[in-house]
Amino acid sequence: PAFSAFVFKIQANMDPKHHDRIAFLRICSGIFEKGASVLHRQSGKMLRLSQPQQFLATERQTVEKAYPGDIIGIFDTGELGVGDTVCEKKSPVTFIDFPVFPPELFARLSPESSMKRKQFLNGVSQLAQEGAIQIYKQPYIMESFIIGAVGQLQFEVMKYRLEKEYNVTVNVEPISYTCARWTEGDVPPEELIGLDNAMVVYDRRERPVYLLPNAWQAGWLEERNKDVVFLQSPPLGVARLEGN
């Protein structure tokens, strides 16, 4: 069988001195060989996995070959995200996305100093790709992000890591929204009725997300748009094997 694997974890700053990022892959089929060029299904790009490693406590060991069930770590420059698929170009496969818990708390995240904007954007981008917290963008706003979490502790961890790992002090300001809705299929926001009390943001896959003050407002939005299927969490991709 052809090689395939999926990214189940990304960890930034495993070596704090170098701000490295390690993407952990689980091999699903075929044999992985060091230096292999693979297809990244989400971007369509070819990636060369030249420095695969396995980890045992604080020790790292270079991997020459890996087999189904094995876990390897590769250095990532920001191309990969949790749930992404890599495979051989001749036998493309895409695995289903990881399910995401619906956020219940939302806040605006911004740097205290505009002089730290570069570190702020870099830190937010890297931590977002770990999948530990949901980060949303507002159209035309680059000075802040909207973050969504299941519990307050996630906000505190995000703030701590930005300060300690990226040297940027941030403000976390709660906003008065308690639920989010995605839509099934490609439905532009301008086609929806009743967004007066909603905040429209975009997730890491550039899908529109509607933040609402409460469940009643969410229900009212759904009632006004009966031909649209609303989801409480991001829509999952469909696993598929192509070219066979």
Name each model feature, range by range.
Residues 1-244:
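Structural and coupling elements of P-loop NTPases
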